[in-house]
Each structure stands twice: as C-alpha cells, then as structure tokens.
Amino acid sequence: MKAQDLREKSVEELNSELLNLLKEQFNLRMQAATGQLQQTHTLKAVRRDIARVKTVLTEKAGA
C-alpha cells in the first residue's frame, strides 16, 4: 500500500481501510499467539500499513 494512493482516498474510505487493517492485525496476532501463523512478516506489514493510514488521516485533519 502506497502513501500516495492513500492520499487520493476520502476520509471515510481511509477510516474503513483502517478498521479493516485493525481487524486483520487482530486476527494475525491471534494466529501468532496460537502458533498458526507461518508468515510472520505479514504482521509487520499490516502494522506499517496502519501507520500509513493514520499518518494520512492526520495530514487531512490538519489541512
């Protein structure tokens, strides 16, 4: 997910994207805790995507 693509989305779309990412992060964390997660790098990628979405939301709130 690119930050430039996120900047083109509306605030409502960003909020729904953030909600989806948070749900995905929760599911991945549960899989990691139970030892079912094979690709642990996805957890890091989702965490960074959440940070990107939050950054763009903050930028839009300030502008």
UniProtKB/Swiss-Prot annotation:
A GO CC term assigned to this protein in UniProt: cytosolic large ribosomal subunit
Family stated for the protein in its record: Belongs to the universal ribosomal protein uL29 family.
Stated name of the protein: Large ribosomal subunit protein uL29
Keywords (A to Z) from UniProt: Ribonucleoprotein, Ribosomal protein
KW Acetylation (keyword) present: no
Cleavable signal peptide: none
Lineage: Bacteria, Pseudomonadati, Pseudomonadota, Gammaproteobacteria, Vibrionales
PROSITE patterns per record: RIBOSOMAL_L29
Molecular function via GO: structural constituent of ribosome
Gene label: rpmC
